[in-house]
């Protein structure tokens, strides 16, 4: 009879790796799916849903990410300050040009589970608008995403 084993938190922390992803000409949704899977640890053999076993991800060139179709023109992103009249509306073009890091972060956050682990998982995501980052000491592995 086979025995099933559960991953311990300490073992998961010891095996974490760093990945570097270049977002140049990648579609936002497809990039976000792959990044969310790596952050959760679903690409590992010993995936356990209740343990944060995912790896760290660094995304560079976030301002070169692509929205398909007419989303850059038609989609709007909303923020509210919880004050009267505090609704801010941003178009897709504005989000890509000024807030591309926030656009990717929101997209990845929407693909994570809605529980206590999601904030902890999202803290392992680092997004930079250009190709310079401050994580050379971690020696990240370059992850080539072949997305159509």
From Swiss-Prot:
PROSITE patterns: RIBOSOMAL_L13
One GO CC term on file: cytosolic large ribosomal subunit
Spans through the membrane: none
GO molecular function, one term: structural constituent of ribosome
SUPFAM superfamilies named in the record: Ribosomal protein L13
Domain of life, per lineage: Bacteria
This protein's UniProt keywords: Ribonucleoprotein, Ribosomal protein
Keyword Transport attached: no
Name the record gives this protein: Large ribosomal subunit protein uL13
Native organism: Ureaplasma urealyticum serovar 10 (strain ATCC 33699 / Western)
């Amino acid at each position: 009879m086979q025995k099933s084993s559960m991953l311990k938190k300490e073992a998961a922390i010891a095996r974490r790796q760093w990945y570097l992803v270049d977002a140049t000409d990648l579609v936002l949704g497809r990039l976000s799916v792959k990044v969310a899977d790596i952050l959760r640890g679903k690409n590992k053999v010993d995936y356990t849903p209740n343990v944060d076993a995912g790896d760290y991800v660094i995304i560079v060139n976030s301002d070169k990410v692509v929205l398909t179709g007419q989303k850059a023109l038609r989609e709007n992103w909303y923020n509210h300050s919880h004050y009267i009249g505090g609704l801010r509306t941003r178009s897709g073009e504005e989000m890509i040009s000024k807030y591309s890091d926030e656009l990717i972060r929101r997209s990845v956050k929407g693909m994570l589970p809605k529980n206590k682990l999601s904030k902890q998982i999202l803290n392992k995501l680092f997004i930079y608008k250009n190709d310079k980052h401050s994580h050379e000491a971690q020696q990240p592995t370059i992850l080539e995403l072949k997305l159509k």
